[in-house]
Structure formats: structure tokens, C-alpha cells
Curated annotation (Swiss-Prot):
Main location, first listed in the record: cytoplasm
Cleavable signal peptide: none
Source species taxonomy: Bacteria, Bacillati, Actinomycetota, Actinomycetes, Mycobacteriales
PANTHER family referenced in this protein's UniProt entry, alphabetically: ARGININE REPRESSOR
Family statement drawn from the similarity comment of this UniProt entry: Belongs to the ArgR family.
Species name: Corynebacterium efficiens (strain DSM 44549 / YS-314 / AJ 12310 / JCM 11189 / NBRC 100395)
Role played: Regulates arginine biosynthesis genes.
Name of the protein described by the UniProt record: Arginine repressor
GO molecular function, one term: DNA-binding transcription factor activity
Pfam family, one: Arg_repressor
Protein's GO biological process: L-arginine biosynthetic process; protein complex oligomerization; regulation of arginine biosynthetic process
Length: 177
């Protein structure tokens, strides 16, 4: 559906996760130099967002302004091309903090690491793990308080659980990390 001015409109409320996923898509496909520009691009997609919410989303996503040697600064999420001369560690640091706050315990089976969180936190954590793009992770599946994280070969679920749990100091099923 489109509005009278040609912009897309959304008939259902957009969740924070969906909105943040769209922000990541936009930042990955083009250089966005300001929050005003990003809010206009989101509006083109049918998402009307306040500056405060957009700023909070960018912070939660670990977005940083990157200034290439020649050119205007732009928002980026994740590692930045080495020609820009800057490595963004923000998202991985944010993941460590999130794991510190949300990870209750870890377990594993085969190539799956199972992360336990407080009720209601699993989808938020899984979404962030996916956005960070750890090379050790193929993907995640989340319930209410449990996240299954699929380890990329040759890692095992135990290795991945120890890696993620070690970042947070979480305990395994028998009190071990």
C-alpha cells in the first residue's frame, strides 16, 4: 500500500526488531550521513520514527560514524572495510555487555549451543547475535528464554557455548562454563 505522496505505508505496527533489521539493511546498502537522512529513508519504507528512538536504535545496533580518508562521515554497523582505516569493535563489545546481563547458563548438543536467558530476553539476544555476525555462528533460533546458536564447523556446540559463556562468565548445566 502507498500513501498519497508515493511513500509506502505500513498497516501493522513495526516491532523494534523489524525496525532495527530495516536500519541495518539501509546502512548496508548505502552510505547514510545523518540521522535526518536515515529517518527519511525509514519514512520511505513506511516507518515514522522519532529522533530519540532512532538514536536509541543506532546505539543498540552498535552503529558508529565512520570518516573515510576522503569523504563525508557515514553510519556503519559491524566491521568496516580496511580501506577506510577503522575497525568497529562496538557491536562485539555491546554483545559482551548483553551476554553479561542476559546469559543465565549455557548447554550444548552436537553443533548447537543453548543459551538460557531470563524470560522474554531470548529473542532480543538472538537478534543481536545475528546482527553482530560472528564468524563462529551460522544463525540462531530463539524462544522465550532459550536461544539455540548453530556453530559453524569445525566448532562444536560446546566450543561455541564456552566462547559465548566465557564472554559473560555464565555457568553451564553442572555449574561449569
Amino acid at each position: 500500500m502507498t500513501m498519497d505522496d508515493g511513500r509506502a505505508s505500513t498497516s501493522t505496527p513495526v516491532t523494534r526488531t523489524a525496525r532495527q533489521a530495516l536500519i541495518v539493511q539501509i546502512l548496508n546498502r548505502q552510505r547514510v550521513t545523518s540521522q535526518v537522512q536515515l529517518s527519511e529513508l525509514l519514512l520511505d519504507e513506511g516507518i515514522d520514527i522519532t529522533q530519540a528512538t532512532l538514536s536509541r536504535d543506532l546505539d543498540e545496533l552498535g552503529a558508529r560514524k565512520v570518516r573515510p580518508d576522503r569523504g563525508r562521515a557515514f553510519y556503519a554497523i559491524g566491521p568496516v572495510d580496511t580501506t577506510i582505516g577503522e575497525d568497529l569493535r562496538g557491536p562485539q563489545e555491546k554483545l559482551r555487555r548483553m551476554l553479561d546481563e542476559l546469559l543465565v547458563s549455557t548447554d550444548h548438543s552436537g553443533n548447537i549451543a543453548m543459551l538460557r536467558t531470563p524470560p522474554g530476553a531470548a529473542q532480543y539476544l538472538a537478534s543481536f547475535i545475528d546482527r553482530v555476525g560472528l564468524k563462529e555462528v551460522v544463525g540462531t533460533i530463539a524462544g522465550d528464554d532459550t536461544v539455540f546458536v548453530l556453530a559453524r564447523e569445525p566448532l562444536t556446540g560446546r566450543d561455541l557455548g564456552e566462547l559465548l559463556g566465557g564472554r559473560a562468565g555464565a555457568r553451564g548445566p553442572e555449574g561449569k562454563v
